[in-house]
Amino acid sequence: MNLENYKLNTSQVHNNGGTLYKHKNVLYKLYDEFPYFIDEKERNIRLLKNLKLYHIPKIVKIIKKGREFNGYVMEYISNSLTFRQAMYEKISKEKKISAIKDVYITLKQLHSFDICIGDIHMDNFLYVDGNGYTIDLDEIRLKGDEFKFRECYLLKENKNSMISKVATPITDNIKLAIVCLSFYYGVDLETIAVNESLTEVKEKLKEFISNPEEIKKISRVLDMNNLNYLDDVLFLEKEKVLKK
């Protein structure tokens, strides 16, 4: 099979050095050249395959080129939009909350294994009919990773990251919170976080959230010194209100 016939146009999407090909109901992700940390990428994909996380595309198999790891095959999530694409779509609050809870389930699962995502932005989360999916996890960080491996991705993230620090559960949560708040309220808070600061994100939120208690809760989530997951602090309460 000639995969070039199925190559996707992903020039605007972060793919961590890989190229995507869609054939039938699966995606092939192949690395254009062997990255410096190819062993870590292989380890990460094998780990994700074995962990059987909720709300991520199922990893079907590993691809080798000779003896070297060259990519993997995963489930294709059809009819999906990235959170960036879905941000301005007419989607009910109930369905948005449902999708946000899904991506937080995945984040909490990873954190329970001492794994951080690090590479968090609106293009790495998919929405489809009330469901949320986390994608592009081949650069997850394990607690025992060597400093050079972590530093490599810190250098990459300095360019377009909301928080220029080595990934921790707190930075993961804050980044994902900004992604989800952008998606929920239909306001691009991510770009403000990247180009300005978390303080400016909070100021922007005050422009369209009149409830001071809600602002207070979000400020707790965006605290760099404490871990307060967004879905626990804000969206569990919102879900109760919407169900009344």
Regions found by a protein language model. Give the residues of each.
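ATP-binding glycine-rich loop module of kinase domains
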Residues: 7-62, 86
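Catalytic-loop of the protein kinase fold
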Residues: 107-127
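Terminal C-lobe "cap" of eukaryotic-type protein kinase domains
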Residues: 223-244
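Conserved structural core of kinase catalytic domains
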Residues: 55-99
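C-lobe/activation-segment region of protein kinase-like
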Residues: 139-220
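Conserved alphaE helix
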Residues: 95-109
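Conserved hydrophobic "DFG−1" position in protein kinase catalytic cores
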Residues: 22, 76, 126-127
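Conserved protein kinase catalytic/activation segment
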Residues: 123-137
